[in-house]
Amino acid sequence: MLEELWSPVAALTAAHRGRANGLITSTAVTADLLPESPRIAVVLARASWTHELALASGAFAVHLLAADPVEVSLAIFRTLGFRSGRTEEKLAEIAWHPGVTGAPLLDDALGYVEARIAGTLEGDGVTVLIGDVAAGARLREGRHFTIEDVRAHLTREDWAMWEARRAEELEQARRARAVRIAE
């Protein structure tokens, strides 16, 4: 059941000291009721390079991808979701520019929110970042990319790559839990 709780498919980006990276997150939600002080909450894998960059810089950007053209969002999904930024520059293949926080803003996104980290909640394998919204915009009209779009368009090879990355993240989370329990 928990796998059905995906929010819209979102890309999360961060940069620090000339290095930029991004990932696909399953959770990005509003985190405050007050419109005069908007906040966003996102979940990202603790083992990811993007996690390190976001914490080091104190900022991140979340992007909604567009359902149309689906090929553009699938390319972003594959690049940010299937590869490791520790071994390659994932954003080299994606058009972007720096935002007001320094976080990369994806040019082909439907829209984005930039935030400065206000707090964190650590899990064994993930961190929840709470961010004070610094900027944001809808770049164009259209429907956002959903997990249903992903399921409808990924190939068997894509799913195998996704599952392999997921297995790595699960193993890292299990090791972190074992260390925490041992302490």
Regions found by a protein language model. Give the residues of each.
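Basic, polyanion-binding surface patches
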Residues: 1-183
